[in-house]
């Protein structure tokens, strides 16, 4: 597993993947800083007139309808079309799906457009699979363990990887189930850590798409990178404000061997 982390992180830093982020306004700047610190290049191109064209030249695309508008929905649809036509991996982050009807309807309408990965919390994943009603806004009310069936259903339905974030992360693909223990509770006290993980997942998928690293391992490595950085940041910070700064620094500083040593991975 250490080799997977080493190779994935090396490719991200060597290739500086260009990630098109159609994401929510609350986390846009934080997401861009996370990508830059990790070794990727962010581009917040989300207008309908430009989204498809840009998705064709990007290495990865994030679709995150956390603060959606009618125009952004159109831009997301165009970006997905452009990504699919060009073979660009795209990631769906189903923010607050299940709890709000309009975004739930939209997410349900695009989930069959073959996202390379879906990343959300347990309640979002359960709701997207049609097995539950969603959480409390962006907060999960289901356990990660309870989302296993939903993640497996979505992985089979899309042919992609499904990642469920929590105290222990769950990574599921058609023939694998992996549990990852890492991170720190302080990550939950900084807005944007989850949403930026979706963007970083797109970066890892884009950087490794032409390698022998599987999409499952690329998604796992992205989560491990964030988890390890969270642990390092927690050792240096005493409160959320200083943690946010330390987290960005740790994403930049940490090497693959340190990531592998700080996370606990088990195959189910």
From Swiss-Prot:
Named cofactor requirement(s): Mg(2+)
Keywords from the named record: ATP-binding, Kinase, Magnesium, Metal-binding, Nucleotide-binding, Thiamine biosynthesis, Transferase
GO biological process: thiamine biosynthetic process; thiamine diphosphate biosynthetic process
InterPro entries: Hyethyz_kinase, Ribokinase-like
Residues the record lists as binding ATP: 119, 165
Catalytic activity: 5-(2-hydroxyethyl)-4-methylthiazole + ATP = 4-methyl-5-(2-phosphooxyethyl)-thiazole + ADP + H(+)
Entry binding sites for substrate: 44, 192
Enzyme class, broadest EC rank: transferase
GO molecular function ontology, one term from the record: ATP binding
Biochemical pathway: Cofactor biosynthesis; thiamine diphosphate biosynthesis; 4-methyl-5-(2-phosphoethyl)-thiazole from 5-(2-hydroxyethyl)-4-methylthiazole: step 1/1
Protein family: Belongs to the Thz kinase family.
Role of this protein: Catalyzes the phosphorylation of the hydroxyl group of 4-methyl-5-beta-hydroxyethylthiazole (THZ).
UniProt-recorded name of the protein: Hydroxyethylthiazole kinase
């Amino acid at each position: 597993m250490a080799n997977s982390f080493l190779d994935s992180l090396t490719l991200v830093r060597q290739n500086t993947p260009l990630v098109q982020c159609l994401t929510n306004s609350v986390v846009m700047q934080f997401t861009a800083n996370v990508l830059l610190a990790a070794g990727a290049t962010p581009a917040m191109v989300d207008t309908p007139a430009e989204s498809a064209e840009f998705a064709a030249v990007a290495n990865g695309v994030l679709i995150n309808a956390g603060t959606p508008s009618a125009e952004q929905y159109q831009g997301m649809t165009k970006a997905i079309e452009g990504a699919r036509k060009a073979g660009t991996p795209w990631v769906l982050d189903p923010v607050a799906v299940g709890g709000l009807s309009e975004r739930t309807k939209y997410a349900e309408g695009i989930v069959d457009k073959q996202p390379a990965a879906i990343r959300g919390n347990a309640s979002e994943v359960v709701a997207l699979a049609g097995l539950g009603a969603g959480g409390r806004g962006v907060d999960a009310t289901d356990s990660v363990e309870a989302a296993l069936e939903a993640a497996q259903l979505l992985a089979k339905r899309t042919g992609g990887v499904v990642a469920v974030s929590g105290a222990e992360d769950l990574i599921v693909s058609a023939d694998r189930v992996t549990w990852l223990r890492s991170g720190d509770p302080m990550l939950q006290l900084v807005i944007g850590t989850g949403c930026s993980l979706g963007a970083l997942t797109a970066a890892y998928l884009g950087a490794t798409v032409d390698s022998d690293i599987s999409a499952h391992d690329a998604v796992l490595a992205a989560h491990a990178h964030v988890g390890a950085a969270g642990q390092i940041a927690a050792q240096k910070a005493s409160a959320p404000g200083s943690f946010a700064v330390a987290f960005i620094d740790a994403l930049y500083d940490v090497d693959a061997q340190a990531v592998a040593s700080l996370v606990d991975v088990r195959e189910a």
